[in-house]
Amino acid sequence: MSTSGMLFIFATFCPCFLSCCAFMSHWKLKDFSFRFLRMCGERSLVVCYPLKLLKQIRSLFSIAIGHLSLMLIEGSANLLSLEEISRTLLRILDFVGNKNMRTYLEVPLCRWHISQARPN
């Protein structure tokens, strides 16, 4: 699948996910997102089939961005956990090797945390 096609799917999916996150309890999202991030951080789970890979990356981005959003809105941000999320996202992006997808994450909500995780 082309980069533009993947970015289109991300751009379509993430706003819907963030809307749904607003109705989820914070502890449930936090628990699920960290378990999912730890699981997806393992290279062995990132498979070579494009569709499955796309679904894993899309889910990872959506959960992490949704979690960052809720933590920042609630004012309960823990810098260590935010840094962990940012580093995990960047590791997945680096492994996939698509630098264009990295710009999709640079929304105002998490730009600072990503820049803290990896200096320019």
From Swiss-Prot:
Residues 1-22 form the signal peptide. It is a single-pass membrane protein. This is Uncharacterized protein C1F8.08. The keyword Transmembrane applies. It comes from the Eukaryota. It is found in: Membrane. Keywords: Membrane, Signal, Transmembrane, Transmembrane helix. Residues 81-120 are cytoplasmic. The chain crosses the membrane at residues 60-80. The keyword ATP-binding does not apply. GO terms for cellular component: membrane. Its main location: membrane. Residues 23-59 are extracellular.
